[in-house]
Amino acid sequence: MSKEIGSEFWIGENNLLHDSNEMPSWLSRFGNVLLTTSGRGALSLLLEQVKPRVKTVLLPSYICNSVILPFEQAGYELTYYDVDRNLNPTDIELIKNSSAGVFLHMGYFGFSTNEILSDLVLTLKSESVITIEDVTHTLFSLQNDPIKSDFIIGSIRKWFGISSGGFLA
């Protein structure tokens, strides 16, 4: 018998994994991975654990509201940096000179549009800024490995017909 889950997907008993402790390679490449119910859940869990130097986050101007929500709920002040029409970050000086305690960046639609930030992320980390990469859009991209951020988050359910799924690494 099938059960309705999330009012969007049907799943039968024979489609469930039982006693599977092995992490798929597309997730294990991120190192220590914690599975969550969603990308938003991964971000919320992370924000409960970290203590930034100041509760201000720097976010790309083109971003899903579900990424913004955990920061708002945790009491962060939100600041945005611009991306151009190709979704490449453009406010490099704003990012460099920001006093934010947390910096979130991402590639879009399978492309490493945030690649330009690689060196800057290392600089921010050396200044005790917590850096987070959201790899939801680039999870299966063969373009590049993630930037060396402190944390990686992602939503798995954007890629599969499943009702929930996210991760924190």
Predicted regions and their residues:
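Short, aromatic/basic amphipathic alpha-helical patches
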Residues: D19-L27, V67-G75, L117-L124
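Short, polar loop motifs at secondary-structure junctions
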Residues: N21-M23, Y62-N65, V135-N144
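Hydrophobic anchor at the start of a short beta-strand
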Residues: V33, L78, T131
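Conserved PLP-anchoring active-site segment centered on the Schiff-base-forming lysine
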Residues: L46-I95
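Active-site phosphate-binding strand-loop segment of PLP-dependent enzymes
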Residues: R85-A169
